[in-house]
Amino acid sequence: MMAAPVMADWRAALPEVRGRIGFDVPLGPVTWFRVGGPAEVMFRPADIEDLSRFLAALAPEVPVLPIGAASNLIVRDGGIAGVVVRLVRGFADIEVQPDGIVAGAAALDATIAEHAAAAGLTGLEFLSGIPGSLGGAVAMNAGAYGAEIRDVLDWAEIVGRDGTVARYAAGDLALTYRHARLPEGGIVVRARLHARPGEAAAIAARMADIRASREATQPVRARTGGSTFRNPEGDKAWRLIDEAGCRGLIHGGAQVSEKHCNFLINLGEATAADIEGLGETVRRRVRERTGVELIWEIRRVGLPCRGAA
């Protein structure tokens, strides 16, 4: 369901910015699934100040959706109304400190892990196994290989929908499994992760193990969006999906991965509706087989294509 009706001429009254604004920008090319309709408006802010001023001046009834690497996202075929804020170069800085790293929201998780390793810092190796960027990782308390963001987060800087910039301690965000309680409409722009000095060879070995594990068990070279469903407490989503007979299941141009069945794949010509429809079929079959209601981990945003059922 979309936000409240927006004034018809809002696009003509956009604030002046130092970044880039585009209209009806296709989102498929920037998502890992390579599907989805256009953003009514795409704003790529130059930096935090540019984003803050834009949001402060933007009519409050205009919906705003932030995206980063779009690695854990299905954009529906009808696109996204309002403004999509895409954080790119001005938000990708990484500063190595003696006991941690401060990084912009657009910094890739794997790149942060590499910077930490190069500085002899341990505790962030798990980030090398998480696709996407830091902003999304904080927003969903991403995790893998026995660790998650709440284990290492010191603070996050967030720009509110009204343009205010505030720093929140990790405890203020109530981080739980694949969830963070962000301020309404807030956009994570920077965060600090703590680490500790470690032995270079051990750090390198741990990261090599994570990369090898991903390569062996996940469809890392496919058009996918990472883990589709959250793991139910005490179980694994992939096991339930397999038990329900969904490994390799095809719907339109989308398929449940044969390699890891908690991953959905765009076989090449899938629509967002194909991928989301396949996910819903998997949820139904798992529910009928096991009684467990799988919860989406991948975010699904936007409108269905006009004329779609």
Curated annotation (Swiss-Prot):
Residues 34-198 form the FAD-binding PCMH-type domain. Pfam families: FAD_binding_4, MurB_C. It comes from the Bacteria. Pathway: Cell wall biogenesis; peptidoglycan biosynthesis. Gene3D superfamilies: 3.30.465.10, UDP-N-acetylenolpyruvoylglucosamine reductase, C-terminal domain (3.90.78.10), Uridine Diphospho-n-acetylenolpyruvylglucosamine Reductase, domain 2 (3.30.43.10). Keywords: Cell cycle, Cell division, Cell shape, Cell wall biogenesis/degradation, Cytoplasm, FAD, Flavoprotein, NADP, Oxidoreductase, Peptidoglycan synthesis. Its EC number is 1.3.1.98. One of its GO terms (cellular component) is cytosol. PROSITE patterns: FAD_PCMH (PS51387). GO terms for biological process: cell division; cell wall organization; peptidoglycan biosynthetic process; regulation of cell shape. The active site is at R178, S227, E297. Its main location: cytoplasm. One of its GO terms (molecular function) is FAD binding. This is UDP-N-acetylenolpyruvoylglucosamine reductase. It comes from Acidiphilium cryptum (strain JF-5).
